[in-house]
Amino acid sequence: RDISFTGSGEMDNGMTISYFQLLSAGSFSSSGLTLDMGDAGSMTFMNGASGGHGISAYEDKMPTASEQAWDDLDGQANGVLTGNKTNKIGYGTSVAGANVSVDYNKQQDGGSGKSLAVDYAPMDGVMIFVAQSDEYAGVNTSMDQTTFGGTYTAGATTVGIQMTSIDKSAANADQDRTHIAASFAVNEDLSVSWGMSTVDFEGAAKKDQEDSGFGVSYTMGSMSLTAAFNSSDNVGGTS
């Protein structure tokens, strides 16, 4: 049901440009244009996609063999940051070994969204990251988002932790999420993973939403088979 169109080319100055457009279920889904300027970084012009820049690229960086522990559940949007992906401009580059990126979009209601993200590998097998965004879309519809965490890889095992805070201008709407996960490559074809996510809602009457899941993937040549087994308790803070 998905049809994608892609194209790329190199300009006379050595820079490369690439484009994609995705049609899903017979309608427009996303499109993007990327200008790779080499050592000067890259610029993206996206609609419906993150383009790898800004906070949208750090929605969830935890290791998994299939789906994240919170995915495909009734409360999957709870505690998960949502970067605005509508008609946005992004830029990314490398500074002193750190990958730095920003993005910005102007919204139709007069508001705007902008974000900054940084990730850094201080040593082999270790990656740490932090990202922050603010979005103004009118009274009681604005929010600030922050996420940070890290992963560590030793041999065939990768473990990670990520913490996300969503501060909404509406009353009693803030959410904080902690996600831990681990993956293990049994061999070059088979991988397994486990994850657990807890969402803390603002409001004394709400309980913590607890998500957990197990994933597995198996690759045979160019084909991959994946499966996820996820469960959730206290969805939306209600038992």
Tell what function each PLM region has.
Residues 1-239:
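Outer-membrane beta-barrel proteins
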